[in-house]
């Protein structure tokens, strides 16, 4: 049972500029400082590449998680596809719920910039436990909105930073 969330934003910048800024782990972590606590790629340069695994420390809907994932495909500056397993710690870590997650990060060039989208999903098991987790996540944690807000904050941060750089005079 999938919870899918699609987010997108128009950014007035070249696709390469957006890609090169967003793919740096320090910028991704900064894009949502209240919910991102670190992103580490298992590569010599600590950057994402096709086939590279990663660990992201984060919080979604107020629940801390450790996401272990893999970048399956990258086509700079257009598309990246990732999947992983997030371990959500409930009740102070007494209960851990592991859920499959994934996403597609895409940049589509438009006449006035690019549309940057991050379409993410959480895969709740098709079992009684999975249905209970999904029900609780949506009913009590407003999970769908929390996931949307989480992803949209990332995109909005990139838009604000990159468009701010475009408007600064060259000597600043």
Show the residue positions of the predicted features.
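Glycine-rich portal/gate segments that line the openings of hydrophobic small-molecule binding cavities
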Residues: 40-96, 110, 153, 160-169
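Solvent-exposed residues in well-ordered beta-strands and their adjoining turns
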Residues: 10-12, 57, 108-110, 119-125, ...
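Residue-level preference for beta-strand/loop junctions
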Residues: 1-3, 63, 98-99
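Beta-strand/loop substructures that line and gate deep hydrophobic ligand-binding cavities in soluble
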Residues: 89-149, 153
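Hydrophobic ligand-binding cavity/cleft-lining segments
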Residues: 1-50
